[in-house]
Amino acid sequence: IKLIEKSTEETIIDDIDNAQEQTAFVLVDLEGTASMAVASAISRADLVITLCQGSQDDADEAAKTIKLVNRQAKVLNRSIPFAVLMTRTNPAITPRTLKHIMNEFHEAGVEIFKTSLIDREAFRAIRSFGGTVNDLDPKQVSGIDKAVANAHALAVEVIERIKGIKREGGQKHD
């Protein structure tokens, strides 16, 4: 897996192409706002993963991203599969607001990952210490093992989705 984090509108396509030559899976992490870099990355995607926390504001932003994906699909005259990934979820309870948001996505025909990223210190620590959850020091950060298991479950689901998309030849969107 290759992660692309700091591309610009001018370099994003070349960065994706170069990464594809090096690895089977390329993840492009871009800001949530619509931009040419985001549109370019979407146009090259096998799967667009839209992040959403359990708030209506986040759900509204996710909906904007989904609309951008659908516009790009029309421009390119091809299907661009996407799914919503719920983030910073509580492992013990699912608040009513989150249930409502997930139901709205479901009713709109938007796929949601079965795996969510649970709100864990280890995931927040990545921004401070860098690297991945596997690189974190258990003396500095708690819950690494649970974060690794959560990340692994998500990785498995992403890979299975991509394999399914490739088998089916894409996904239809209106």
Annotate each PLM feature.
Residues 101-134:
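Beta-strand-loop-alpha "switch" segments that mediate conformational coupling across diverse proteins
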Residues 149-174:
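Charged phosphate-binding loop/patch that engages nucleotide di/tri-phosphates or the phosphate backbone
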Residues 1-27, 32, 36, 138:
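P-loop/Walker-type NTP enzyme "switch/lid" segment
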Residues 53-54, 81-96, 115-127:
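G-domain G4 guanine-recognition motif of GTPases
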